[in-house]
Amino acid sequence: MSSTSLAWPRTAKSSLLQSADFSSTSKGYDRLGRRAREKLLDREFFLSLLNSASTKREAKSYLARLKAQHSPKPQVKEPEKESKDDAPQPLPSGVNLGSFYGASRSVYDSPVFRHDSTPTPHREISEERLHLSLVKLTTPQLLDDYIIDGVAKTLSQLNRLGMASCVVVDPGAGDHPNALRKIAAEQADRLSNAIDALPDSKSAHLDSVLSLSSTDPDTPTVMSRKALLSPMRDGHIVVVAPIAYTDDVRAVVVPADNAVLALTKELAGLATRPDPDEDPWVTAQRIGDLQREVSLDRVILLDPLGGIPAFSGPQTSHVFINMEQEFDDIEQELLRVRESAASSNQPSASSLLDGDASSIADSNPISKFVNHDVVPVPPEQEAVLPGLRLEERAVDGHLENLSLSQKVLAMLPSASSGIITSPLEVANSAMAPQTTPSGLAVGTRRQRNPLIHNLLTDKPLLSSSLPLSRRAAINGRRGSLTAPSSHTTFVKRGMPLTLVPNPRVQTWTAQNRPRMSLDDPSIDLPRLVHLIEDSFNRKLDVQDYLNRIHDRLAGLIIAGEYEGGAILTWELPPGVEDDGSPASEARMVPYLDKFAVLKRSQGAGGVADIVFNAMVRSCFPNGVCWRSRKDNPVNKWYFERSEGTWKLADTNWTMFWTTPNLPDDLQRFQDYEAVCRSIQPSWADDTGVVD
């Protein structure tokens, strides 16, 4: 959403930009009165908020959720402990009767023997649930001050939006533990100072969070849950160095990934060790109380490498990763690239940085990515991993980020998500737009902040099913000549994806039709019917539909537990006989017959993207067509993902396709149109409404 869509007067908009830029420096901020400070803080905050949301509706929706989270809870009337008849009558005051009247304390304190166990009352959690993000900032010692300041500013804005943050500073690997410990402590102080320098922002650098046991010296644990959570409840951004203390009070540097895993385990309520003598119900109740106390909603990895790159297909990076479906494939892809980088005869990292990289750019698939997107390694860091070249270290970094995200999300609820991006991208989006001496903004706008955008929408900056050709205009700065591509990766534990038949075993072609039907035992037909009816909000004539697609089924895509899906068929244009001949098979049209997502899963979780990507990348990579009502509100989503569209004259249909260069093949185009015109719907209500 561009700033011009707010329809502000030019003077008001330039004033807002000027004030936002002025308020970003504490020096100018200190010269203002209290009321002026509050106004400037609010202006900058809401400007960033509106820039980071795709639509006004998303921003308003989040603000409504935020208000609901912090609304006062209704007071619950406590039940009377004793009935009126049983309660002791009050004695007249002014006369000390001692213990003569009424029961003595010894009676009240005497134990009561019961045959049954005394029920344990449920302990209500007095404090409201704390929503937080766990952040890992990799090698901050390599980052300029303005990047650290931009990261601090974004964390402060997240805090104001109701998302507390705990940041783990990662100094990287090295052979000198004492030097690493010093770097970690210095960088934690550096980030903490940057946060404290911001108006109305507070940090807490905790240096005694983790401990190491002699029985398990490789796995750190959290010393005190209360010491970790209390500062965040008070509005502080917690900064932690990956330093743990042993039983003999020695400070030891631990891998930052291990620190993140230990914090995740504690915040997820999974660090409690059950007592074998404790009632399992009591143990479950205790763990449940811990989990209701805190909600770890986001795991954010800020790494100079940025998001996870892609080396197969047209995309250059993974915008969204469904871990259940894609983790193994992406891991294997990165391992193959690393093996290629290790086996190729590459010069050293220093020679790459001196300008010799262009000669080998074509010989290694990661070279181009490294040359343009990795923060240069200073000479003093060159010997950190002397046995690895720059490309190998880059791939190793991506593998570590991918693995850490997978391990962390496996401990969290499915609603939690992860973000992998670069500190530079976060810092650039946190900077106010440049202004001219006259006070007018230059023809660029703020980049959408990937962290704030994700908090508002629970979606990636770009849809993963969006074609590469359409990403630049949406991702880049409107009005600029060049639109930088986003390397932010949004990660979800996600859901499994079922493709029937499996295209890796049997390709989806007209010659290899599976000759199956929807009442096949491998398909849960009642759940599939519920999915279709819930998505379309109409009753399906099941038998009529089964008859229509009989012997035409190309395959089925099911996301999760029938949360989304697609039914694809092979259709013949009217007048073409299905006689099994090569000529007949050549005329068959790949057709998307049903595309459905449960109402509760629409607009969130990326279910539609997961199904659509499977269809166009795995099942029908050479193209598929479908139709939709001309007034269907989903058409905007279809327009952005199709290669072309065609409004069918004298009908209420619009035809979409992903087949490259379809209009150049007149016969093929006419077959597509004939199929989209001729298919009859199979709805039980028979209202006459097409679709």
UniProtKB/Swiss-Prot annotation:
* Gene Ontology CC terms, in alphabetical order: mitochondrial matrix
Pfam families tied to this protein: NAT
Q: Please list the residue ranges that the record marks as compositionally biased, kind Polar residues.
A: 1-27
Database matches in PROSITE patterns = GNAT_NAGS
Q: Where is the composition biased (Basic and acidic residues)?
A: 75-87
| Primary subcellular site in the record, as a coarse category | mitochondrion
Ranges for region Disordered: 1-29, 65-95
Residue ranges of the N-acetyltransferase domain?
512-681
Q: Which GO terms describe its biological process?
A: L-arginine biosynthetic process; ornithine biosynthetic process
Q: Which UniProt keywords apply?
A: Acyltransferase, Amino-acid biosynthesis, Mitochondrion, Transferase, Transit peptide
The EC designation for this entry is 2.3.1.1
Which InterPro entries does this chain map to? GlcNAc_Synth_fun, Vertebrate-like_GNAT_dom
Q: Which domain of life is it from?
A: Eukaryota
Q: According to its UniProt record, which reaction does this protein catalyse?
A: L-glutamate + acetyl-CoA = N-acetyl-L-glutamate + CoA + H(+)
Instruction: From the UniProt record, give the pathway where this protein acts.
Output: Amino-acid biosynthesis; L-arginine biosynthesis; N(2)-acetyl-L-ornithine from L-glutamate: step 1/4
Places the protein is found: Mitochondrion
Q: Which GO terms describe its molecular function?
A: L-glutamate N-acetyltransferase activity
Functionally, this protein is described as follows:
N-acetylglutamate synthase involved in arginine biosynthesis.
The family this protein is said to belong to: Belongs to the acetyltransferase family.
Q: What is this protein called?
A: Amino-acid acetyltransferase, mitochondrial
| Biological source species | Aspergillus terreus (strain NIH 2624 / FGSC A1156)
